[in-house]
From Swiss-Prot:
The modification N-acetylserine is found at S2. Functions as a component of the nuclear pore complex (NPC). NPC components, collectively referred to as nucleoporins (NUPs), can play the role of both NPC structural components and of docking or interaction partners for transiently associated nuclear transport factors. NUP133 is involved in nuclear poly(A)+ RNA, tRNA and pre-ribosome export, in GSP1 nuclear import, in NPC assembly and distribution, as well as in nuclear envelope organization. InterPro entries: Nucleoporin_Nup133/Nup155_N, Nup133-like, WD40/YVTN_repeat-like_dom_sf. This is Nucleoporin NUP133. One of its GO terms (biological process) is positive regulation of DNA-templated transcription. GO terms for molecular function: structural constituent of nuclear pore. It comes from Saccharomyces cerevisiae (strain ATCC 204508 / S288c).
Amino acid sequence: MSEKKVHLRLRKELSVPIAVVENESLAQLSYEEESQASLMDISMEQQQLRLHSHFDNSKVFTENNRYIVKTLQTDYSSGFSNDDELNGYIDMQIGYGLVNDHKKVYIWNIHSTQKDTPYITVPFRSDDNDEIAVAPRCILTFPATMDESPLALNPNDQDETGGLIIIKGSKAIYYEDINSINNLNFKLSEKFSHELELPINSSGGEKCDLMLNCEPAGIVLSTNMGRIFFITIRNSMGKPQLKLGKLLNKPFKLGIWSKIFNTNSSVVSLRNGPILGKGTRLVYITTNKGIFQTWQLSATNSHPTKLIDVNIYEAILESLQDLYPFAHGTLKIWDSHPLQDESSQLFLSSIYDSSCNETYYILSTIIFDSSSNSFTIFSTYRLNTFMESITDTKFKPKIFIPQMENANDTNEVTSILVMFPNAVVITQVNSKLDSSYSMRRKWEDIVSLRNDIDIIGSGYDSKSLYVLTKQMGVLQFFVKENEETNSKPEVGFVKSHVDQAVYFSKINANPIDFNLPPEISLDQESIEHDLKLTSEEIFHSNGKYIPPMLNTLGQHLSVRKEFFQNFLTFVAKNFNYKISPELKLDLIEKFEILNCCIKFNSIIRQSDVLNDIWEKTLSNYNLTQNEHLTTKTVVINSPDVFPVIFKQFLNHVVFVLFPSQNQNFKLNVTNLINLCFYDGILEEGEKTIRYELLELDPMEVDTSKLPWFINFDYLNCINQCFFDFTFACEEEGSLDSYKEGLLKIVKILYYQFNQFKIWINTQPVKSVNANDNFININNLYDDNHLDWNHVLCKVNLKEQCIQIAEFYKDLSGLVQTLQTLDQNDSTTVSLYETFFNEFPKEFSFTLFEYLIKHKKLNDLIFRFPQQHDVLIQFFQESAPKYGHVAWIQQILDGSYADAMNTLKNITVDDSKKGESLSECELHLNVAKLSSLLVEKDNLDINTLRKIQYNLDTIDAEKNISNKLKKGEVQICKRFKNGSIREVFNILVEELKSTTVVNLSDLVELYSMLDDEESLFIPLRLLSVDGNLLNFEVKKFLNALVWRRIVLLNASNEGDKLLQHIVKRVFDEELPKNNDFPLPSVDLLCDKSLLTPEYISETYGRFPIDQNAIREEIYEEISQVETLNSDNSLEIKLHSTIGSVAKEKNYTINYETNTVEY
């Protein structure tokens, strides 16, 4: 026996001090401080193991500044079946725990730190119905020699292990020393037992429900039928002896206390009060009907004393009724617990609100007065973190107040833990029971357990709650000592849970569900504030769980990436519809930058050349920004500056170095872009996080700024790299080998430009139009997107090209790619049909434009007959842009009037001049012919006239062009030099281009020639211009032509020129148009139109001195004025016009200078 005692003593010396040291240090040593130092030089797997393990072989599952949850080194689950009904119990005062099913009980030292915890196994007596019997209730008792006084030593410092009481059916079995029966079968251990038959009607379904070790008085147990039994376990000599207290031994009654219960009443709480003396202790009893009693029990006195007997149900109900009217009829009493003040108790109750299907759990502090058998409700408040209804009838919520076990505790703060079936709510309140110092909560928090975790028992000590689970052993909920309020900033509720999920959720077999209960009400502002704090800590590596450095930057980045993924997963599950899209985008941006750093780091560390360029870029940045950054500080502490430096790096690599480097360098740069932008941003950031995890719509953008990876420099670099690498591969004949990389770059570019378009549509139009950077980005896309598709088609990625173009609605790219396919193939035809249906109007219009641009008119008109109506609509909406094609369709459709109008619109309008002369003539002739097929009632004579006028103008242009080519005409000698000669030369060059010349230019060109025919033609054109010229221009040109006729006539070479031209004017009846003036001195000398504005409008497009040409025209007018110095010119004009008019029998109105018919 002595050897055994030595062995036990040695085992305690090995194990207990470790546990004692741990318990003493938990309040001062937080998990992160303990593990931080050794995180430096370990692998990722080793790090995770080390990160969450303590030196006593326990494993931390979560921690914040208020509590720690960890598992003790206990694995009793292997001894039981998963289907077994288990009961558990821990007595921290004794220092042992137990778990039992209906066959056996396991008992172990709860403070053991051994890897393989030794167990004491006690089998139960086998009965015929054991397989269907309920598991017995078991409780531990103090060692026989244990000092139970208030000044007793810690029981774990004593040698004896204590005893065990089993309530099996109606029988109580007591073993004084559990070590003496370890692993003995029941027959061998039976001689060590002491038994007592209890008046429990087990055959009628009555069973032990609650048990309380209230030593030194004995034990108290209650049954499911509301009966209570007090049993002493030792006689007056201290020897083991089970004895049912006389208090329960009255005939025809279930017990002396039974008068307070009815068939619907059950005991919900048995709690110990203080030890009053040798063998005497107070016990508190609460029922579900609100009856509360205080009893003084003694091991030597068979007559317990009842000190308090009250019903608190109606009082609690009344305290809730005003705020919660639904409390009436739904109030349930669950548990009670004594507070530090021996006269006060904390009660847990619940009420149910059917309108929202929520259960509110209420903590009521009640002060009792034993002298008057009365009570007062001091405070009432509701738990805010747990609102589920209790559906498991076997589980009742329980209150634990660890500080109560510390007799010398003078802390003004009381920690309260409420254990629910799948959660533990922890709160701290002020412990002062003073009406001027209300018992308001300091804080409240919740630790949720996984749904598959079953709680089978519990226990607690001065600092912790211990929860026995069926699957995970013993979980310790350690409440930290209250810190000074000013020592650290208060950590918000959301941030606390976010941090726990980030840093602890990936621990293997973690029993904690880190997601918040959905019923918790949290305001958006506090949620977003806390989420921003956590994201900043991970991003800038200043979170308390993030190591300052690991072996490599890659390892450090990977750790933070995993933390950020945990963070985003938690956000998605708990706050996805409670935070703004802007915050989501901010979180995504941080993750993407971090991920991009990882990808970037993995590439440049493999290339000395790229690494040197990066270091030089970083040095230049430091020089310009007056910084002292290193790659390490950028990646670890300042990743927000990485995009700026990365942009400078890419610009230098792509635009400076790329063309002159070898193919391997170019391949590395291409891989770098794909790894960073495609893998790091598009796949792992945008696709996985933005759209799949956080469920953002592509249209949801932060209108205040563009996404971090979209700016002109990035887009320009990626676009340039794509083409430079393509050309390099083509030169060495390896383009097909790198087609997958090129495809990724195209996907990058399309996504970036698409996001830019979405964002730009949210901005004010004025600010967009005024921003050159935005214009440059738009131009970059317009200039290059068709070429991206062209390259992909080159490497036979037409299918992928079509998919991309379809997805991003790049219809011009889609059409271009479809046109590279066999147009007669059934698959191609099917694709066209698909896109006609998918984009009914847009695709058709884009296809029509492409076919017109590439002169595939046969396909336009005949290949897609089912699109005929859409084609007509296209021509109508795009008129007159595509009128040169629309008329063909209109003629084929028999719409001759429409065809005539279309052709008129594209030829008659002077602003459309510049097209081919022959094409314009063709259009006009077809329009004229179409008029012959138009019904008379629908024919527009004015339109027909305009068509004829334009045909006449074209004839005039062809005439002068041919004469100039043949040398049959020449410029008047007066214009051999000067600005007018320059205008002449310019217009002659325009004639050579065989495009339609403006009517005003044509008139002026004719007026510069020196023969009668050339000077008469512009007069004919001006008389029938069909309103092609406005009034001022026409007036100016009339004066210009007549003036030059008069001046040429005044010279020797132009004698009788004026008379001949006037005669031809009357012969062809040009004056019949009232807009046609006859020559007069006033008309020839009119200077009113010769303003700088008019000259600029008329001659501004010519590269000549406008002042010079204005002076030359003034000189012409001056010469006319000289000719009329003696009024001779006026007389000559009248006589010439009069003689010709008389000959033709016309009457001249000299006041208006017109002919009267």
